[in-house]
């Protein structure tokens, strides 16, 4: 090979070898200069998606209850139980204002027969409609949502040693209002939401159930209203990293269980109202504008007649 050709060959090889490095450098530069990224906190819902845009965010959650709050709000230690849940929200923008979605779930828990088993959880279908889209730096948005819970999980016949408690048994309707705005030149995003479960939900019960009934019971549970309120803030410290602070207040106005036990005696029990206040710190890592990971924990810090949950969780958010 001539010296001239050898020189050209070496030059070509050097250029080819440097091209990936150059591309990576450009990508790194682009990443460093990129805008702040957000994928949403653990609990506060998102506003409607643009038309033709979809989102899926599978969660893996492990929940323990090392204590409970009594009727006076005192924290009392208890034997911790652990349950694993997979929760998969899926949303799609039909128009710029209307987003439809569904949430699938499954539980993996200990069973009476020993070991663990999995079961399908309740399913939710939803519709979200944008009420206001603001201009300017804050880009404030307001939306209203309607969610219907379908009782696809297990809530009774729990005396079966192979059966996992994974649902409520009740078809319920929830109405929600939620808002979002940006601050600090787009580096801080705030969300707030409140949701009300409408009255009238009820579940038929046979045997042992999530409502505290025993084997042989036949009757029903009627659920009162419930409310969940969240506030959150996401702060972008780097194009790839976002810190999340969130608080959640949940209130259940009790339920009533009526029926007959295994001896044929009448049962009429009113469960008291309960509430819980939780903190949900989290951190986000963004692989790109459309893919990110969030990891955090729900910590029940105060309440009445409810468990002091500790629920570490991780999710992958994918836009498409």
Residue ranges of predicted features:
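Residues on the lipid-exposed face of transmembrane beta-strands in outer-membrane beta-barrel proteins
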Residues: 45, 56-58, 88-92, 102, ...
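Transmembrane beta-strands of outer-membrane beta-barrel pores
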Residues: 60-66, 76, 104-110, 131, ...
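Outer membrane beta-barrel transmembrane domains
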Residues: 63-76, 215-320
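Detector for outer-membrane/organellar transmembrane beta-barrel domains
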Residues: 51-63, 163-263
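Surface-exposed strand-loop-strand hairpins of Gram-negative outer-membrane beta-barrel proteins
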Residues: 28-31, 61-86, 160-165
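Repeated loop/turn-to-beta-strand initiation elements of outer-membrane beta-barrel proteins
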Residues: 97-102, 134-137, 186-190, 240-243, ...
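Residues that define the transmembrane beta-barrel architecture of outer-membrane proteins
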Residues: 82-86, 116-123, 140, 167-173, ...
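Outer-membrane beta-barrel biogenesis signature
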Residues: 25-67, 135-139, 143
